[in-house]
Amino acid sequence: MSGGGEQPDILSVGILVKERWKVLRKIGGGGFGEIYDALDMLTRENVALKVESAQQPKQVLKMEVAVLKKLQGKDHVCRFIGCGRNDRFNYVVMQLQGRNLADLRRSQSRGTFTISTTLRLGKQILESIESIHSVGFLHRDIKPSNFAMGRFPSTCRKCFMLDFGLARQFTNSCGDVRPPRAVAGFRGTVRYASINAHRNREMGRHDDLWSLFYMLVEFVVGQLPWRKIKDKEQVGSIKERYDHRLMLKHLPPEFSTFLDHISSLDYFTKPDYQLLTSVFDNSIKTFGVIESDPFDWEKSGTDGSLTTTTTSATPQLHTRLTPAAIGIANATPIPGDLLRENTDEVFPDEQLSDGENGIPVGVSPDKLPGSLGHPRPQEKDVWEEMDINKNKIKLGICKAATEEENSHGQVNGILNAPSLGSPIRVRSEITQPDRDVPLVRKLRSIHSFELEKRLTLEPKPDTDKFLETCMEKMQKDSSAGKEPVPPALPHKPCVPVVTHTDHIWHYDDEYLPDASKPASANTPEQADGGGSNGFIAVNLSSCKQEVDSKEWVIVDKEQDLQDFRTNEVLGHKTTGSPSDEEPEVLQVLEGSPQDEKIQVGPWTDNHHLKKESSGVVLALSAECPATAASELYTDRLDLQAGAASQFITVTPTSPMEAQAEGPLTAITIPRPSVASTQSTSGSFHYGPQPEKKDLQPLEPTVELYSPRENFSGLVVTEGELASGGSRVDLGLQIDHTGHDMLPNMRDGDTSQDLGPKDPPDHNRLAVKEFEHLPGETEERSLLLGSENEDERLSKGQHCIEVSSPGELVTAERAQLAATEPLHVSETQNCSVLPNQDKTHEIMKLLAVGTSEISPQAIDPHAEGQIGQMAAMQKNKLFKDDGIQSESLPRQQGDLSAFLHQEGKREKVVPRNGELYHCVSENEHGPPTRKDMLRSSFVTRHSRIPVLAQEIDSTFESSSAISAKEKLLQKKAYQPEIVKLLVEKRQFKSFLGDLSSASDKLIEEKLAAVPVPFSEEEVFAPFSRLAADSHLSRSVEDSFLSPIISQARKSKIPRPVSWVSTDQINGSASPQFLPRPPPGKPPVRPGVEARLRRYKVLGSSNSDSDLFSRLAQILQNGSQKSRSTTQCKSPGSPHNPKTPPKSPVVPRRSPSASPRSSSLPRTSSSSPSRAGRPHHDQRSSSPHLGRSKSPPSHSGSSSSRRSCQQEHCKPSKNGPKGSGSLHHHSTSSKTPPGKSKPASKLSR
């Protein structure tokens, strides 16, 4: 075939494709494909292996497969043996033929054929053309090099049509001729192309006949009038001007009829094949040609052509790839025409697949891998006999010996290497034909064994199933001693290959008669290979598969497309017909690539699909034990590892998903690795516990990541699920995932729980990563958050504003996920919270809060201010906490019950919280620097990561506001002041107030929940809570003064916050004076009680429960409690369901949805709102005002925050802390400075 520049060979000698076909030598090649002589290890026969790069834009093999299968059983058509594809190339295996006619003609001494040979060849070519037309296809590249003589004595006198890469279906499903395109583009080879082709007109059946006419003239004359002209336009003009009757002088007189007839045909007219055949018959009679006469090349000793080295088994495949094989070197691309014309419109179900690579047609079921007998005795290659170099074939095989062994580590070469459909090199000893027999036997036995294994696999029509199978295999491999998840990554390369390779559904020999998806028996070996190779041979049938193997479950188009999509590169691989303009009937192939693209997402897409459809990933995490989650993650990790880049490319199906995926996509991939690692370490324990420890030191990081990434995944899931499914499910799923991960992390490393204790590991790791990540991440996440959030918020906010609260939640979640890892972590913590119901509510609240948090994330300064405000409010909160604790104690019984539940949840959460603390600390580190620069004037509190404290303080600040409001409500002057201040700031910093209020509530809850944060406690379920509370206290301590000063300094008016700040300073400062190191904050029973109460409130299974209990607690505890309850009642609907709040959220989101969404999530807990009825009111409007920075803390998210605070205390710490609290923790001064800019920004 002509065309195309030299490129390195796709395959090398000795390579084993699909563990079945061993490459012996390259026969030909061109721009878009290569042809190899290969040895079928099953049948021991030589076959033609046609390969095209998976990356090349023009893919023709799928069309070739489609047409070749359609033509099976026709004379003059090669037997189809198999096909497939992997990440590197697509391939088709067919019967190997002898030399092509162009080669044979040139081999003649005169470069011409005799009339006898020409007439007999012409008649066979006409028959082959009629055959392809009979199935509704045009060849469109009729030329001597696309016809070859058979290799064996039985077929050496039969001419076979080759290369259907440029074929086009000219009939529709009804069998009617398709309407021609006005401009079709040039197809074919310039020398033999018809005038219509040169005119870019739609080619019809008569155009193939015109090409035949030119061939006949060339056979007889040795050349055409335009022989030396290469330019298509010039040749076209010559053809138009040339009197074709002049050509007849070289042909028998009867051919005038042939010329007249084809000249009279048009696109719609069916040629009279019988008439044309009669022309040949009459001419044969006229010239006295006998069918049995030897062809010119068979005449021994007449010319050296017989012994030309090129004859050595030169397959039917031309020494030169035809334009079709090359991708139509001579075709003129017409926009939209090239990619789709051929294959896309062929068969919707037609796809390159190894699934069909079964037993060759000639092979009986008995002669499968298990059987030693060859399907049929190999006939001697007549061409080899004529070729002095006939043995030359064996030479090339001997190359890759040790190299193969070393590179593949294959003891058995073919068997052991997970070729995943990728070529495997055969040991040199195997290379020689004589040695192939034992190898074949071994292969057969192995394949039989593998086939059995494979047969045990579920039918793989589903990509998901395929992925699951791969994951199982991966897991098995990893458990077998492959490496833990990280090794899985190395293994992952295989996995991606597997995805592709697996996606190489083997359609074997058999072409199903109309089968859109021909399925042919897959040899056990193949089936086996499919399983082992990663090729998902969907063959469900027994080892002895029928040629017609309809049992082969051919993956659906979409699934196949997913297969291609597994690597988006593959997705690009999807072969497009030459013309995009016209969908062609043979669209299957194109679809399959797209499907593969979908699979590219197998991880992400499937993950998303699973999330969307059933939250499978999360759901699995939730539904399945941690192990399942980790398995899923691990599997996905494996899949993702290879497909990570591809997965990243996966496009979100919805704006929310896009938002979630935007940053999350990247995160998603990391998450699988890290998250998987975590979950894996915890659940699978792939590696030794030490590895778990490693993971765990990483786990803080991982959790940091996983909070981000996992949570990002969760968030993505939330966003996606929220968009696609129920957020509640997400919440549950996330919780389960969190639980799974947390338990895994716990199992893997208590140090994670000890995060504070192991700060060296977690904090250091977290710090390192978070300094990198926080600074980078926070900044990046802020950048991402800000950019992504801004973009998303631009999208998400718009969506939030426009969309329903639920959507807001989704968008916010996505935003949150994208906004900050901390926020993500925060959300994740919330998600991870054991209490699913609460988690759902929280998730909802978080979703709402997320929108708030996201805005916050966008504006770190705003976050800082918010954090400061929150801290100030927290101080108030502590004062209020004192009050509330008094009033709440009454309710404590109920709260304790809730706390017990929530404590359990928080047991899980604290770890995340710890991670978040670490993350917050780490994140705080970089932001803190900024903050320190910004707020160096602010008093520095202990630099010890008071993140939890800060977070707690933030929570408390919000809680304090709620409590404060309660106190204010109790004390008329306070409520009045608060109201006045709130009213003033409703427009500016109402969100800040809300966030403060929610922060107070949250902190109160945190204080109650965290209690002491000791290593023991860290290990203990409540230890996490204690840690959170302790951290929150420390943070509060560090935050209070700076935050108060900053808050006071901050221009964001916070009436409640100001009052609360004073109160907080008064009451909280003593409480926070200790500022214990992050490792072990002092235990504060009172604070813990308050936190627990709020926690209980926040963690209530349902908003109604939460609100009712809060109401009871608050009412019983104090008027403030009542007001809190009241606020919660309205707020809770806002928070979880957020109907009222949703408007608020949009308001917040528009102004500060990024930040506010990040903080609001934590602060948005319904309790904080409950704490502040007026805040509820404000939260709808004030959120708008304050959502800019503090609002994010206060906003409607505040109510969420309070609930989330309990669950997400760490997470809240993460986001808030990261934004402001963390800065404070690093340097409380810094946060204030930051908070000021934040408040300015918010304003």
From Swiss-Prot:
Binding, ATP: I27, G28, G29, G30, G31, F32, G33, E34, I35, K50
Record's catalysed reaction(s): L-seryl-[protein] + ATP = O-phospho-L-seryl-[protein] + ADP + H(+); L-threonyl-[protein] + ATP = O-phospho-L-threonyl-[protein] + ADP + H(+)
Biased composition (Polar residues): 674-683, 1115-1129
A GO term for molecular function: ATP binding
Signal peptide per UniProt: none
Modified residues (Phosphoserine): S445, S786, S1102
CDD domains from the UniProt entry: STKc_TTBK2
Reported consequences of knocking out the gene: Defects in Ttbk2 are the cause of the bartleby (bby) phenotype characterized by defects in sonic hedgehog/SHH signaling and ciliogenesis. Embryos display morphological defects at midgestation similar to those seen in mutants that lack cilia, including holoprosencephaly, twisted body axis, abnormal limb development and randomized laterality of heart looping. Mutants die at midgestation (around 10.5 dpc).
Biased composition (Pro residues): 1073-1084
Renumbered residue ranges of the record's region Disordered: 674-695, 737-761, 1063-1086, 1115-1243
Domain spans labelled Protein kinase: 21-284
SMART domains (UniProt xref): S_TKc
EC code: 2.7.11.1
Biased segments, Low complexity type: 1144-1170, 1187-1202, 1227-1243
Residues of the active site: D141 (proton acceptor)
Pfam families attached to this UniProt entry: Pkinase
Superkingdom field: Eukaryota
Function: Serine/threonine kinase that acts as a key regulator of ciliogenesis: controls the initiation of ciliogenesis by binding to the distal end of the basal body and promoting the removal of CCP110, which caps the mother centriole, leading to the recruitment of IFT proteins, which build the ciliary axoneme. Has some substrate preference for proteins that are already phosphorylated on a Tyr residue at the +2 position relative to the phosphorylation site. Able to phosphorylate tau on serines in vitro.
Family the entry assigns: Belongs to the protein kinase superfamily. CK1 Ser/Thr protein kinase family.
Assembly and oligomerization: Interacts with CEP164. Interacts with MCRS1; the interaction is required for recruitment of TTBK2 to the mother centriole.
Name assigned to this protein: Tau-tubulin kinase 2
Lineage of the species this protein comes from: Eukaryota, Metazoa, Chordata, Craniata, Vertebrata
